[in-house]
Amino acid sequence: MCEKKYAEMISIVQKSDEEWQRLSDEMTPEKMKLIQIIMGLSGEVGEIVDNIKNHIMYGKELDLNNIIEEFGDLYWYLRAGLKSLGINYEDMKENNIKKLTKRYPGGYSREKAIQRRDKEV
């Protein structure tokens, strides 16, 4: 992807999610496979992990600009993945809130996380 497209995408993301989605649609080839999206997500997470690892393990300065860039990339892949699966972004957020409310009624705590029972068979 060329710098012009990245700059345009950044500008549009700042305006609205609808406009951002339009640009994302243009940039995502119709035949893009879900595995490419998942690999992209994984790669971007790896870059964030590496940045934080270098900070914690080797005392390097935390590169917040890089982390912001990588989270932007994660957001792009997330939206592309949801679109490819026909999942609405707002529905995904709502379902996540329901899951967490069920898992941690009354709010999260370390103790509740250890004793959680929502995954028992």
Residue ranges and their predicted role:
Residues M1-V121:
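Flexible "arm" and connector segments at domain edges
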